[in-house]
Amino acid sequence: MRCAAFEKRITATVAYDVLDDGFEVMTSVFPALVCKTIWTAFRHHSSGLINLLTGRIRKKSILADWALSQGMYITVTQTPYEFYKNLSQHSLTGLEDHLTQDVLLLAGEKDHYIPTNQYYRLKGNIHHARSLTCRLFTEAEGGGQHCQIGNHMLAVDTILKWLDQVYGTH
């Protein structure tokens, strides 16, 4: 979506799944008080506190350990603080008005990874897209989890049908 905001040769973009703030995603796996502490420590560049706190939490939470390990691997960073510095650049805030293409937003209602509020926030902040299609998959249809784990074909079918609609009319 960031690319689509700046590259007008892109005529359609799919957010599978939505993600408008990477830092928020990677701190939402923590309890509220810990999340607030990490946000405050990050604003004060307290790398030692962040690394210590996340290190302790990773020992207690498989999800937090996986999320941080995977994130540091993908971003080629060595510490949680470096990872958070990298993530702070992964935001769509202020870029939504630059999305003028056809846009498809996908999310799962029970996503364990990306807070559902990001789906609603992004949906509410895209005003200049040629078209905006939003799909929140449910548990009942088997698509309520992150990237529709358990029913990938539901998402794939939705994307393919949407692409047929978009490119069939342009």
What are these model-derived regions, one by one?
Residues 123-144:
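Catalytic histidine neighborhood in serine/cysteine hydrolases
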Residues 138-170:
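Catalytic active-site module of serine/aspartate enzymes centered on a nucleophile-bearing elbow/loop
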Residues 22, 32-68:
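Helix-rich cap/lid subdomain of alpha/beta-hydrolase
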Residues 112-118:
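Conserved alpha/beta-hydrolase "acid-adjacent" motif
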Residues 77-95:
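Active-site nucleophile elbow and catalytic-triad environment of alpha/beta-hydrolase enzymes
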Residues 14, 104-106, 135:
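Conserved hydrophobic packing residues within short motifs/helices of P-loop NTPase cores
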Residues 99-100, 105-107, 111:
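Short beta-strand/loop motif that positions the catalytic acidic residue
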